[in-house]
Amino acid sequence: MNGHAIFENVRRYRSIASLYRQTAAFRPGQRWSLLEQASEWEARALSELEAYFAARADYAAPLAA
């Protein structure tokens, strides 16, 4: 997957997390469940970014030598 697709996925994941947080503000009875789901989407975004940059670092390391 190219960098543009990765960043688009991250943007989508963070948008979904934001929607969960916004919904949590208006649904006190479900707040903790919604915030947990938001946290999971944020973790997914972070994981995708980490994997992307780790792959770039692995690719760039032999070029630098």
Residue ranges and their predicted role:
Residues 1-65:
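Long, non-catalytic architectural segments outside compact domain cores
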